[in-house]
Structures are given as C-alpha cells and as structure tokens.
C-alpha cells in the first residue's frame, strides 16, 4: 500500500493511467473506466475497470478496483472531517489492516488531508459479491461465516496496549444522555405507534441511565478491543463464485477502540430474525470464541456476558441512526426491524438487570477559560462569535450585537442593531479583514472594543458606528441601503443567572441585566438594569445548511427561558435549552417548538414558543442577511418582544429565526 499524503485523489477525474500503474503495481495500465457505485452520504465510491497494456487481468492483476473519496457536499465533508471519519478509515487500512488479513479488501493507496477533509482509498474490488440484507436477515450459514471472520479480526488485537493509546482510534464519543434523550423523543414522535410496550420499556430504561451505562462499560475491568462500529449485514459483502474472499467487511469509518464484544452483540442482535437467533445463539457464540484463537484472554462465559451487556448498542443505534439520516421507506422498515430484534435480544438475555440506576445529568457550566478567544482549527467554516442583547420595554428600545470571526476566510463580521415600536431600525452591518486582536477592531466607520472584564460575571461593549436607519426593516433582508445615522452602545452585561454550556457544541449562554448608555443621532438613552442575554460560540458553523429558531426570554418573576430548535434538511428537528428559576435552579429542555407566521417581506408577524408555552408580541425588528462565499443566503429575522406565559406571567426577550434561501450569486 502507498500512503502518499502529498497526492490525495480528490475526484475520479484526478486519476491517470500512470498513477494507477504505480499505485496497483501489477503492470502498466493503458486505460480505465469509472462507474459510480453505492449511495453513501459521507463519502463516494467508484468502480475503476482496468485495461493493461501488456495483457489481460489475472490472479495478480485485478480486473477492477474501488476508489473511495470524500463527499462533494460541503456539509457532509465537514461532518466527516470533524468526526474524524476519514482519518479513521485511512489509518485503519494503513496501520491496522496489514496485521489482520481475513475479510478486508487489499488497499493499494490511502491518503488523507486532515486540514481539508480530502481523502482517498484505492481498494481491491470485493466482487463478485452479494451485499447482506438487514431486513431479510442472514441464513444460519451466513451468520456462522460472519461471526467466525469477526473472531479472526478481533483475536489478534484484544487488549492491545498500543492501540488503546492511539489518539485517532480513541476519540471521545459525542453521544451522551443529554443528546440521546431528545433524539429518543423525536423517535417516539415518529414511530411511537409501531413500538411494542415491552420494547418501549427497554428504550426508556436505556435512555434514562445512558451516561451511567457508558461509564460502566468503559470501566478498567472491561476488556477493550477493536470495534468496527457498524458490523451489520448492510456492510458485509458475501463473495460468490470467482470472488477472492468469502466475506468482505466494508465501511471502516466508524472504527474505534472500545468494549470488545460490541460488534458481535450488534451483529447477533439483528442479523437473524428473533426466533432464528434464539435457535442458533449458543452455537454462534461458540464459533466466535473458537475463532479468537487458543490464546484469547476471554472465556466463552466472558463472551456471553460481554454480548449481553453490549446488547444495548443495537437499541441505541436504531434510535440515533434513524434520527440522523435522511428518512426513506426502506429506512423506516430497517430501523423498526432493528429496534424489535435488538430489544428482543436485551430481553432474552435479561440485560436490563445490568443497567445502572436512572439519573438526570447535571447541566454543564462554562469555565472562566471559555471566555477567552480560541485558536481556530483548519476547517474552512470554523468561526468564533460573541453575542449580546438587551430589551428595555419601558423606553421601547431593544438592541443586539454580534462579532463573528471567520478565521480561515480572514474575515470578521460586525452586526449592531437597535429597534423599537416607535423608532426606525438602526443597523451597522460591516465586514472587515480579520483583526490581529479579537477584542479591539475598527475602521473609519466604526470602533469596537469588548471584553469579559470579570469572566462569567461581567461583559462590556463599547461601540461607535456609522449605521443605516430603516423605516422598513425588511429592507435589511433584501440587502438594501438605509439612511446614514451615528449610533453608540456603551453597555455592561452583568450575569443574572446560571451560565449554561451546551452539550452538543462549543457554546454557552448567560442571562444578564444590562446597564449603560445608547445614542441614536442626537438622542440619548440611559439603560438601567434591563433584561438581556449574551453568548459565546466557537467551532465549525455552517449557517446556510440548516434553519432554526433561537430565543432568550426573561420573565418579571426572575425566570429565564432559553431554547433553540434546529431543523436540518433530511433529519428531524432537535432542541436545546433551559428554564432557570429565580432560585438558581436549572432545568434542561428537550423539546422546544414554535408556531410562527411571516409576512411577504420576510419579517415575523407573530409567534408562539412551546417551552412554557409563551405568546410573543413583537416590539421591534432587527434582521440581518448573511451571504456565504459560495452564494448561499440566509435571512435572520430577529425581533425583541413582550411575552406572556399561559399562566399570565409577563416579560421580554429576543427571538431569532434562521431561514435559508436558494443559493444566488451577488
């Protein structure tokens, strides 16, 4: 295998006969043809048929090879890069596969650029072969072949100390209890009438104790090993007459180091219909154990107990995978089949008895170090932003500010807007070169200084800008110019609640009281301890790949409500948020929904948030329009509003919608 990092094949068009000749090393390739195969979302596969200059293909000359490259879709590529999927698969074929043999395709070339996500794998073609069918299930003979080959893969690496320390193989899982709970809520909302009562018990017990389950299975006394991570029939190719191998395992992007019996349990839980599994279960466990080899550090009883404990992995995969991939009719049938069979596996082995007690995760809090600026990674859409708002109902004035640093585009965005029911909307919307100092920047038209003067307690903003005034704020969504006017914000945000850190991404929110001065032309406002919010966010942010509704609301009784409902095309919506009482107690929210209507100008007319629920009466509009480098456009209608809860409590706050438009060139 060649690992030429300097020469990554990004697309099939990059292939040449000379390159294929060198990579395969089986003689001069005179010509080749390319055929797309498979429908993967994170990567793309192509069959490359080869014509040799000095003779036909033979035993040492493959007739065809398979090229695997990163997805062309930028969102999919960023996801694959951020999760380490591309690096894992390349490193597996380069570092681990040569030690194993067995059901693994030969690799002729493997390379990855971890700064861009470009990668390639040139693999032996598994054909002629038949892919397994998760819904129909395997025959007993196929299941026996699969567990034997899996045992031969696992055996040489059980307890390997070097692999246990390899950073690329031991990335922390992003999944935890706070993440799986809202995914399960969406799962029940979609499939609830198809879930048997006894299977719902399994799911609810797992979700309620998920963090404890993960900690329990990562304990030092649990033997660790190589995990394919998705060892199921859809990733197994059964060789037919003329194939080089009886079985080929594909899609190693989820390879990791973890509980050794996970793959076996996942396979046994669903590869056979429930009654067939029960009939052949013990024989399949024995076949796997024997395939581990005579020096395996596991007894047959150890294998059975490990499979029992890991039977929940399949339940988790049925819930999570169904909520994160594009919905299809076959997908629905497959996920319901998975859930039924894996839950039966849990019940048949009495695995519920191994779960720890249910627990509610404590809300996360940011550290003082989180208030600092962060070093960017190489992802093109990595950004860091600081946001702060206020709403002064007595004076009819609301405002917000955001500084966004898009490091790898060498650009900074500054937004500062003021609005109210009896005033035009004022907007400073500026793009400038990335500053050397993230805390101070300016041009002839604005000066900005900001700082967390007391980390997690006090944040200060000093802004002077030549803004634009709009009697019709929807003009901002159309990119139109307004009337020039000077404005300033000299404000301090003092923390008025518990700082809240997201679990799913690097971001935190802080409810505040805001004081200071604002000027609009010759008009001065004195802001005295009014409700507000601030947040700080850093990481890969593609605002043009999803829609959302965000809110930060503050009630007169001291309650703070925050929620965001994110809507990604092809996936169910999911939510993050909290309710904080005046006593400092924080309750995390799993469901945040909204009902809103928009005018033809793109501004919200009215809305209801379903987190209390809350009715919203818009007091001022302060929208922005964001255009990506590739022409994609997002409209951000933003409004501050008076709010009323169902039980009559009142307050104020800000609401934001992100609404993506078709790409355009500006």
List the model feature ranges, each with a label.
Residues 359-666:
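Structured soluble/peripheral alpha/beta segments that form catalytic or ligand/cofactor-binding pockets
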Residues 285, 289-327, 598-634:
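C-terminal hydrophobic structural anchor segments
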Residues 130-228, 239-242, 334, 338, ...:
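ATP-dependent phospho-/nucleotidyl transfer catalytic cores
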Residues 91, 254-295, 311-331:
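Active-site activation/catalytic loop segments of kinase-like enzymes and analogous catalytic loops
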Residues 1-32:
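Juxta-kinase regulatory segment immediately upstream of eukaryotic protein kinase catalytic domains
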Residues 39-55, 66, 210-260:
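Active-site acidic catalytic loop and adjacent metal/ATP-binding pocket
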Residues 44-46, 51-52, 57-178, 261:
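Conserved ATP-binding subdomain of kinase catalytic cores across diverse folds
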Residues 309-359:
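ATP/Mg2+ or Mg2+-diphosphate-binding catalytic cores
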């Amino acid at each position: 295998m060649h690992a030429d990092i300097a020469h990554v094949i990004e697309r099939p068009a990059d292939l040449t006969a000379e390159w294929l000749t060198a990579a395969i090393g089986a003689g001069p390739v005179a010509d080749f043809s390319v055929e797309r195969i498979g429908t993967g979302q994170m990567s793309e596969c192509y069959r490359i048929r080869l014509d040799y200059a000095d003779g036909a293909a033979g035993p040492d000359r493959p007739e065809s090879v398979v090229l695997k490259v990163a997805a062309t879709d930028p969102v999919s590529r960023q996801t694959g890069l951020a999760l380490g999927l591309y690096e894992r698969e390349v490193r597996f074929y380069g570092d681990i596969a040569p030690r194993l043999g067995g059901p693994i395709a030969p690799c002729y070339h493997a390379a990855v650029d971890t700064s861009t996500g470009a990668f390639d794998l040139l693999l032996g073609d598994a054909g002629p072969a038949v892919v397994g069918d998760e819904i129909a299930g395997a025959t007993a003979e196929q299941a026996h072949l699969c567990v034997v080959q899996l045992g031969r893969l696992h055996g040489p690496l059980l307890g390997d100390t070097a692999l246990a320390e390899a950073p690329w193989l031991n990335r922390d899982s992003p999944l935890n209890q706070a993440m799986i709970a809202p995914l399960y809520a969406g799962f029940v909302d979609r499939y609830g009438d198809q879930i048997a009562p006894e299977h719902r018990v399994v799911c609810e017990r797992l979700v309620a104790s998920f963090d404890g389950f993960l900690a329990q299975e990562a304990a030092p006394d649990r033997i660790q090993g190589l995990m394919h991570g998705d060892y199921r029939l859809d990733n197994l190719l059964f060789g037919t007459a003329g194939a080089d191998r009886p079985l080929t395992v594909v899609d190693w992007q989820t390879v990791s180091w973890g509980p050794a019996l996970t793959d076996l349990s996942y396979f046994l839980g669903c590869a056979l219909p429930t009654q067939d599994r029960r009939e052949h279960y013990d024989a399949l466990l024995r076949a796997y154990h024997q395939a581990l080899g005579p020096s395996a550090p596991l007894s047959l009883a150890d294998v059975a107990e490990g499979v029992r404990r890991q039977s929940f992995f399949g339940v988790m995969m049925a819930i999570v995978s169904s909520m994160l991939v594009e919905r299809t009719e076959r997908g629905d049938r497959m996920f319901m089949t998975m859930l039924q069979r894996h839950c039966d596996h849990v019940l048949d082995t009495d695995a519920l008895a191994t779960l720890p007690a249910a627990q509610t995760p404590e809300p996360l809090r940011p550290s003082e170090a989180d208030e600092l600026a962060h070093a960017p990674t190489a992802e093109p859409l990595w950004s860091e932003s600081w946001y702060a708002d206020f709403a002064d109902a007595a004076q009819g004035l609301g405002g917000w500010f955001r500084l966004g640093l898009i490091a790898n585009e060498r650009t900074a965005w500054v937004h500062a807007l003021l609005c109210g029911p009896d005033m035009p909307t004022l907007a400073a919307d500026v793009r400038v070169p990335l500053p050397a100092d993230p805390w101070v920047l300016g041009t002839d038209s604005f000066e900005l200084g900001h700082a967390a003067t007391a980390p997690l307690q006090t944040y200060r903003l000093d802004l002077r800008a030549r803004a634009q005034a709009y009697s019709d704020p929807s003009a901002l969504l159309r990119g139109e110019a307004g009337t020039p006017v000077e404005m300033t914000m000299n404000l301090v945000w003092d923390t008025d609640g518990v700082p809240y850190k997201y679990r799913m991404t690097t971001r935190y929110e802080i409810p505040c009281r805001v004081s200071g001065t604002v000027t609009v032309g010759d008009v001065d406002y004195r802001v005295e301890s009014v409700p507000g919010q601030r947040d700080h966010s850093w990481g890969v942010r593609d605002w043009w790949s999803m829609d959302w509704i965000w809110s930060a609301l503050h009630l007169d009784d001291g309650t703070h409500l925050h929620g965001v409902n994110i809507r990604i095309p092809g996936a169910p919506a999911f939510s993050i948020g909290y309710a904080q009482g005046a006593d400092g107690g924080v309750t995390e929210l799993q469901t945040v929904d909204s009902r809103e209507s928009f005018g033809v100008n793109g501004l919200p007319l009215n809305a209801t948030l379903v987190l209390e629920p809350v009715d919203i009466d818009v007091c001022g509009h302060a929208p922005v329009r964001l255009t990506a480098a590739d022409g994609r456009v997002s409209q951000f209608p933003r409004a501050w509003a008076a709010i009323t809860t169902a039980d009559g409590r009142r307050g104020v706050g800000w609401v934001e919608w992100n609404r993506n438009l078709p790409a355009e060139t500006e």
